[in-house]
Amino acid sequence: MAGHSKWANIKHRKAAQDAKRGKIFTKLIREITTSARLGDADPANNPRLRAAVAAALTGNMTRDTINRAIQRGAGGGDGEQLETIVYEGYGPAGSAVMVECLTDNRNRTVAEVRHAFSKCGGNLGTDGSVAYLFSKKGLLTFVGVDEDALMDAALEAGADDVVTEEDGSIEVYTTPNDFGTVLDGLEAAGFKPQSAEVTMIPSTEAELDAETAPKLMRLIDMLEDLDDVQEVYHNGSISDEVAATL
């Protein structure tokens, strides 16, 4: 689940669950393989692949596993021929939800995604219904580093913005195309991100309360459990007090 920094603790807790971990790795490998098949097998020349590799590394996937996935994609052959489709919809309290999928069967995928929305009190929208509320950006998150030094290094590397959150974590934003360059520059300067991804950042938020927040979480869980779903983005905002009860 990708959303906003307020979800970081929930996202990382979910990622640590053994039941989820295997599925997360499967999704990462599919993204790496597809990115290598559709573009250059060298991450330095393929921004989408570079982002997929970065996400896999911060998720503790081994280099060997990553390289095998790249080789499988670059080799073409008779493997899965997947296409990327993004579905848009509405969750509880008018929250905007985008669902990024990799699929070999559009009909199956849209039926499963629509069912999840309907089951959780939301509804699947049309193309463009919520996409305008999001911007695609590279996002690098750092903890326990010197703020001034990181800011200097990030801006030198070509980052768009650097934001310090209330919990002390620091988020570095980039354009999707500059993501790899900024990541390489920061790592060369000695800064290793806690997480690194190209994600969708909402421009507005939908405030959720103790009643609607669990419904959005249920929708996200149902969507993420679908094999064809790679990422779920949303603009739901939940207070720390409500988040602690989820």
Swiss-Prot record:
GO molecular function ontology, one term from the record: DNA binding
Cellular component annotations (GO), alphabetically ordered: cytosol
Pfam families linked: TACO1_YebC_N, Transcrip_reg
Source species, domain of life: Bacteria
Keyword Cytoplasm: yes
GO biological process, one term: regulation of DNA-templated transcription
Transmembrane segments: none
Intracellular or extracellular location(s): Cytoplasm
Entry coiled-coil feature ranges: none
UniProt-listed Gene3D superfamilies: 1.10.10.200, 3.30.70.980
Keywords of this entry: Cytoplasm, DNA-binding, Transcription, Transcription regulation
The family this protein is said to belong to: Belongs to the TACO1 family.
Full protein name: Probable transcriptional regulatory protein AHA_1522
Gene source species: Aeromonas hydrophila subsp. hydrophila (strain ATCC 7966 / DSM 30187 / BCRC 13018 / CCUG 14551 / JCM 1027 / KCTC 2358 / NCIMB 9240 / NCTC 8049)
